[in-house]
Structure formats: structure tokens, C-alpha cells
Amino acid sequence: MRDEINQGVYMEEITINGNTWQKYKGDEGQDVFIAKFMIPADDLLGKYVDESFYDVLIDNDADVYLPPECDMTKSQDCDNICLKCMDESRLAFKFRKNVFTPEEQLGAFEGLYDSAVESNNRGMAAGPRVEQSGHRDWVTPFQQDILEYYASGQPTPVDGSNPIETIIEKHKTKQHETRGSVWLRSKIEGEFGVYTGFFDVAMERFASMPVDEATEYVKDIRKNMISDTSYASPMWSGIAGFYGRYPRIPYGRETSYVEHNREKFEKCYPFARKLDKEFARLIPGRYAKQKEFADRLDKKFLIGEDTTLTTITVNTTTSDRNARMACHRDAGSLNEGFSNLTVITKDGKSWKGGYLVAPEVRAAINIQPGDLLLIDNMRVIHGNTPIEAPDSGIEDMLRMSLIFYFREDMDKLGTWDYEKTRREYVDSRRLNKEHELWRPFWNGVSPSMWHNEEWYDYLKAKDKGLEWLEDYHPEALEEKTTLEGFFE
């Protein structure tokens, strides 16, 4: 440990397991850590972390910065004191204890708890999948490799090794992937009689067949007995708030949960407003950037209509739900802004563990109900340690984590009424059996649908049609020599 005085600040240098941080007290009495290292951790994406992945456990107010972007060993005027190089661009996270009142937490709990359902859309965050999970029968990497070997005509290794034994050895310790296909159980049972143990029987069949016959048989299994939909490991997760456009749903909108539970959702507004206020106070530069985007957006797409937040990811862990996160970077939130993490509970129910770990800087945070973590979750790899039941028993396990953010794709939206009109237009096409593109199960969407006369004519019939054409479709007006007769 080395102590120094720099710019009137008492600074100490801490080294643990060969990793070094500079540490000093901030202007609010918080601990400030500056990592002088950055450990590559992309190989951890999709994998779980435990206590071996951090050296510093933070459970009091703290700021943690990534190392300076400069090369300290080559800078002639560098005094090896990183304080003067730190700004919001190097901030990994800020952690503050006891930010939210019990009333604010209760409102968030009641307003958001029911939005979390079993989900397969969390990708890396969902963690490694197991052979049977969430009512799905996964095609394991081992099974995939066996099928590939036989489908490829049983190629002979140049080293003379047994390819089946090589595949078995390869998968003895290898972690499963985070996303994959599933077996169609009904098809498997129709072919093999029972699902349990069928792959051992299948391997015996493959081995007993001539090469060409085995190849065709395996190709048939791949085609007809495996779903072509890719799934992630299931976890209890949900989205509340608002969405931007999506290719198959090309209009801004409320999430399904908010659309059907608006009054309940509004209970989270005081919590969201407190979070937004603390964001502005603690990271004013990044907040100002996010506010620029929020000010361009129709306020009806903002949570509470007065924050810089559009969307909330909700994850829950109870006695029968597990929301442990594998290592991941988040996507979709505004790059110029900043994200966050909070956890809440109800009736004093708690948990053990569940530390959020940032393995690149070897730090973990013990987030408890009422605390606020502001984190650069698009840049910093993070996951959490196992979440365990309290001493009172598994039935008292209850943990809900919330991530509030501004969705970057929402910057492309028009006004609330314009986006609503886009939705009405899609629905009108979908329900119109006389439409030239109509077919069973058509969703009403087609290529170039927003740049043709059918859409322009639809807008003409609306009170704000001319205004919307001028704002969002000037090309429609350019096609007319005058506006006279435009609304014929």
C-alpha cells in the first residue's frame, strides 16, 4: 500500500491478488476507486460468476472508475496519479445506499411485480442452459456434435482417434451454451417409444447402419425432430414501459403489461422520479445527454411523462423463480446516457448473495433494498453471484431487480398520436381480407409500406394528416406540384 497527497486529496494505493486500485474519499464521503487494470473478460460472457471473480466487495457509498485511457508508461508528464484524468467517460458505476423510501419501494413493487414472466429472450444474461429446463428438452452441444458427425458421413480423423470418444471427452467439462434448439418430444416418442434415454438408443442405431443410411437418417432427425426456433435458458423477466419500432411491429407503443395494467404501472412513478433525480445529481453530464433525447420524444413515451426514462426490465427471484444473471453486456439502452440497477422486496423478505460482479475490474456490489447503482451496463461486463434464501427459509425468498433506461431506438419515433395511427394502419391491413396482400395469419406488414400511396392516402383522412406528411413524409409532398387537391 502506498499513500499520497494529490490535489489536496489523501490517496492510498491498494493491491490485492496483483490488481491495483487508487482509493480516496469523494466529496460526499464515498469511497472512490480507480482501477489501474482492466482484465479481458469476454470469455465469461454467458457464464456465471462467484466469489472468485472479485477482490473488492462494495457495500457502502462508492464510485468506481475504469483505468485512464492514456498509456501511463509512455506519458512524459504523467505522475501516476489518475485522479486528474477521471471524468464521467471513465465511470464504471456509482453506488449509493438507502436512496429510496419504503413507500417508493412499495409502489415500485406493486406496480411492476406482475410484469415479470418466464422468458427466453435474455440471451447471455440467462446463463448456461441444462438438458431439461423450463419445460423444454434442449438439444445439447454433445448431441449436436454427434449428429453433425453422422450427418457429415462419419469422416475419419487423420490421427486415427475414435471420433465418438473424442466428442464424449470434449463435452465432459464443457459448459452448455446459452441459446439453442429443442427436441420435439412428440416426434421423438413416436420414433423411439419414450423420450427418456432415446439418444443412447439413437447412437446405437447410427453405429449399426451403413454410412450412407446413417447420414440420411440423421438428416431426417435434424429436419423433423428438432424445432427450428432458438431459445435461451428460461428466467423470470419482463419489460414495462414503452417500446420503439420493430420490423414486425413497426410503431412505438406501450408494452403489453402497461397496455393492460396502466393504473397499476403508475404506482412506480415516484420511484422512477427519485431515480431520475439522483441520476441528474450524481452524473450530470451523462444525464444532460439523455435529457436531450428525452426532450425530443413525446412525453407520453416517458415514464411518468417527466423523467428521462422509457423502459424498465424487471427480474424476479422467489422460491420458484430464479433470476440469476450470467455475465453479459446490456443492449438497447442509450449509449450517451447511463443505466442503473435497483433491487426491492416486500414485507421484509430478503436473500443472501446476489452480488453484482464486474470481473473486468474485480469488484462486486452488495445491493440491498433501497440502494441505487448507476452503471455503464453497455460497456461493463456484469453478472451476479448465486442468490440464496434467507435463514428463515426458501419460502421467504423474494428479490426483484429493476433496470430503468432510455431505449435508443425510441429516438426515431414520431408523436404519440402518429405512432398510434401507424398501429391502426397496420391493424386495418391485417383485418382487411380484401387487401391484395392479405393471407391467413398475415400481420399487416409489408416491405416499403411506409413509402407508398396507400399509406399517404390513409394519412390524408386524419385531422393531422398534412402535418404528419410534412414532418415524417416530405417525399409525399414533393410528388405534388401544389397542395391543391391533395386531400381529394
Residue ranges and their predicted role:
Residues 1-240, 483:
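Fe(II)/2-oxoglutarate
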Residues 2-19, 27, 34-35, 108-112, ...:
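Charge-centric, low-complexity intrinsically disordered segments used as regulatory activation/interaction regions
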Residues 23-25, 36, 47, 74, ...:
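Context-gated lysine
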Residues 50, 323-325, 458:
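A subset of signal/propeptide-processing and intrinsically disordered low-complexity segments
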Residues 87, 97-99, 318, 379, ...:
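A broadly conserved detector of short glycine/acidic/proline-rich loop/turn motifs that flank catalytic sites
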Residues 241, 247-389, 394, 398-403:
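Active-site-proximal segments of catalytic enzyme domains
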Residues 337, 346-488:
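Catalytic core of Fe(II)/2-oxoglutarate
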